[in-house]
Amino acid sequence: RYIDKRIPKILLCHDVIAQRVLRSSSYLMQKICIFSERMSLNLPNAHIFSFSQKDCDLIKQIYHKETNLCLDYIDEQIINKSPDKVEDYFTMFGDWRRKENAEGALWFINTVGPLLRKKVHIKIIGRGFPNKDVKNIVPNLNLDILGFVDDPYKILSQSKALISPLFTGAGIKVKVIEALACGIPVIGTDIAFEGLPPLFNSFMLIA
């Protein structure tokens, strides 16, 4: 509101905060976040963009604001990491300091892991993985916690698939797009695939 009303503005909505808080927050927090987001989107002379048609439609539905669809940028080095070989492991990839990422990964390890009948090797890439919250040693789950990696896309592109168990959050998940750009399939929950067009359905397994 402190910016000159005559100056055109571009607002880029990576995700719709209202959807995120409606899934996981208290009633009071929902009201506060929706009010704050509405104030931001009502800036005068602003042009709103979002990465998915789903979020464009949500902004229209909740805030009655027209939103333009734009594509997320994928670096050329990621696209060029198409797999030259597929090795015998899966990947999990993200900033594990984010609650929704850590909770999903721990759910998979502690709940799905004990059900595995064959040995499965998973390379976990990214900062802040909560090792201490892995409840038990799972016999058929070999976890390789790599932490921060300078070039995660080589590891990603040579894996069998990215595993992305998400139960909260909103917006397009960039790590899912990056995995698809690397040429590998993704195994995830419906929230992991939110906003992606049906064009990619053959590369996505909702589990």
Task: Label each region the model flagged.
Residues Y73-N80, D84-I137, I145-P152, S157:
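Conserved catalytic-core segment of nucleotide-activated headgroup transferases in glycan assembly
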Residues F203-A207:
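Conserved acidic donor-binding segment of nucleotide-sugar-dependent glycosyltransferases
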Residues D4-L22:
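Active-site proximal beta-strand in glycosyltransferases
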Residues K175-E178, P185-T189:
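Short hydrophobic beta-strand element within catalytic cores of glycosyltransferases
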Residues K54, D72-Y73:
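Carbohydrate-associated surface elements
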Residues S157-G171, C182-P185:
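Acidic donor-binding loop of glycosyltransferase active sites
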Residues R38-E66, F129-D133:
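A short, active-site helix/loop in glycosyltransferases that binds the activated sugar's phosphate group
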